Amino acid sequence: LQLCRGRIGLNVEIKPSAATPALEAETVRLLREYGFDSSNCVITSQSYETLHKVKELAPEYPTGYILALGVGNYYDLPDADFFSVETTFITSGMVNAVHLRGKTVSAWTIDREKVATHMLELGVDDLITDKPDMVQDLLARNQQVDDSLIDFRDLLNALLHPEQPADSSDDAEETITDAVEDPEEFVDAA
């Protein structure tokens, strides 16, 4: 915890057993001692009872219910702020149902770019991966596309709703024609 403090956020998974009855309390104590709070730490577990204990001890920490199977009626569980679901069970309907309740979906384990892209298309909020470089590269490329689309939208708005004299309409028409005929070149130029 000392090495992580100030460098990265944590997703702490609690795996309770009969031999560790105070595991939730000890986990919360250590997180607080090392300066981890709700801004840089979430607590997850496959045990809903564990999440309930954490919320009683430290309601400020976001808690995630880890679901090996993304089926059932779990959306309204009060002690789960988000759901961590294996990618096979994530559907757009499930993501929408969770989002309608003001909660989020984390997908695990993302180790292929194709799977990461699919999860982003479904609207998941977080990608849990063993290959952070791959996910960072994908997110950076997606951001570049988003920025280009925003620039394109702004340019089209400026062309379609000019605040300049009407004599600039020939230029606007030519620019729109160029964009329609060769959108990739137009976006690259923007």
Feature map (PLM): residue ranges:
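Short loop-to-alpha-helix "cap/lid" segments that border enzyme active sites
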Residues: Q2-D170, D182-A189
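Intrinsically disordered, low-complexity repeat segments enriched in small/polar residues
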Residues: D178-V180
